[in-house]
Regions:
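Conserved beta-strand positions in repeat-built beta-propeller and related beta-rich domains
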Residues: 27-28, 33-39, 75-81, 119-132, ...
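A short beta-strand motif characteristic of beta-propeller blades
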Residues: 9-15, 51-58, 94-101, 146-152, ...
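A short loop-to-beta-strand structural motif that recurs across blades of beta-propeller domains
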Residues: 42-44, 82-84, 136-139, 178-180, ...
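A short helix->beta-strand "capping" segment at the edge of beta-propeller domains
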Residues: 2-18, 47-51, 97, 194-195, ...
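Short loop/turn segments immediately following beta-strands, especially the blade-tip
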Residues: 182-190, 289-294
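Blade-level signature of beta-propeller repeat domains, shared across WD40, Kelch, NHL, RCC1
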Residues: 252-304
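Beta-rich, blade/repeat-based domains predominating
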Residues: 16-30, 59-76, 102-118, 150-168, ...
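Loop/turn-rich, solvent-exposed surfaces of beta-rich toroidal or solenoidal domains
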Residues: 178, 182, 199-236
């Protein structure tokens, strides 16, 4: 089966360049897209049309790396080495859990709320690429603040997603590079039957952040190739979407009917972008999708 190449016509959502845009998540109650700029220490939200832009700054020297939504309307936020709550209405921060990531050069990275109601977050070696080692791990944080290490031996944990029925989990290592599949029990949070799902290379697009659509297809940001890769549930690459922005970091579905894609990207000052990149690197873009996404799971909030 041949791979379909799609050249979409996205538009920038904001007239702003972000240093390391990541973790977009659509809040269906507020009808806002939340996302982070890790290196700037910022959390942002904006409407699907690009209006009502607001920003929150993480308590220095911490940096926000990943977001989830809670049942009470707060955000659950992965910082460098901890997980906290942020109330977007009041700006109040509340602690949830400290995470022992090991080395001082290791930090938390990609994270999401799973179908089990826990916040899952991976860690990464933040040293220069040629010095990185598999010191990262995958953690599960429960609403009462308990932390369980579920997996270790990762270089850059990334690409967390779950299937529509919650019984398949995906995890990527951006420096593996690989994407693995697990059987998942949404009642207990147990992972089993690990298998290799895909091995995207630099040309195909090193796997960064991801999302899953309503058909159970896995969308991976191919950060090194400037594209989105759409994989079938059996691991076959069926589409790749060439993007006009270099270095995309993570897609998510949102907007009306969850039929828009939002894609964050990173800026690399001093590095020339590919010739086809017509949008500045670090731009947040949006484009119509051919299929709907899945509503995000919500973290049970102690506030109710």
């Amino acid at each position: 089966m041949s791979v379909i190449r799609i050249v979409p016509e996205p538009r920038p959502l904001l007239d702003q360049v972000f240093r390391l845009g990541e973790s977009p998540i659509w809040d269906d109650r507020r009808e806002r897209l939340f996302f982070v700029d890790i290196d700037a220490g910022e959390i942002h939200h904006v409407t699907a049309e690009g209006s009502s832009h607001r920003m929150w700054i993480a308590p220095p020297p911490d940096r926000p790396t990943a977001l989830g939504l809670t049942s009470a309307g707060r955000l659950v936020v992965a910082l460098t080495r901890s997980v906290v709550f942020l109330d977007p209405d009041t700006g109040a921060w509340d602690a949830l859990a400290e995470i022992d990531v090991g080395l001082s050069t290791t930090r938390l990275n990609d994270g999401k709320v799973g179908p089990d109601g826990a916040f899952w977050v991976g860690s990464m070696d933040e040293r220069p690429v040629d010095e990185r080692e598999p010191v990262g791990a995958l953690f599960r944080v429960t609403p009462d603040g308990r932390v369980e290490k579920k997996l270790d031996g990762l270089v850059v944990a990334n690409g967390l997603a779950w299937s529509p029925d919650g019984r398949t989990m995906w995890l990527a290592d951006s420096r593996g590079p690989w994407i693995d599949r697990f059987d998942f029990d949404p009642a207990t949070g147990e992972m089993s039957n690990r298998s290799r799902f895909a091995t995207p290379d630099e040309e195909m697009g090193r796997p960064d952040g991801c999302t899953c659509d309503s058909g159970g297809f896995y969308w991976s940001a191919g950060v090194s190739a400037g594209r989105l890769n759409r994989f079938a549930p059996d691991g076959r690459l069926i589409e790749h979407w060439d993007l006009p922005v270099a270095w995309p970091t993570m897609p998510c579905f949102g907007g009306e009917g969850l039929r828009s894609l939002f894609v964050t990207s990173l800026a690399r000052p001093g590095v020339a972008a590919p010739a086809r990149a017509t949008v500045p690197a670090g731009t947040l873009i949006t484009l119509p999708a051919q299929i709907s996404g899945l509503p995000p799971h919500r973290f049970p909030d102690p506030r109710g």
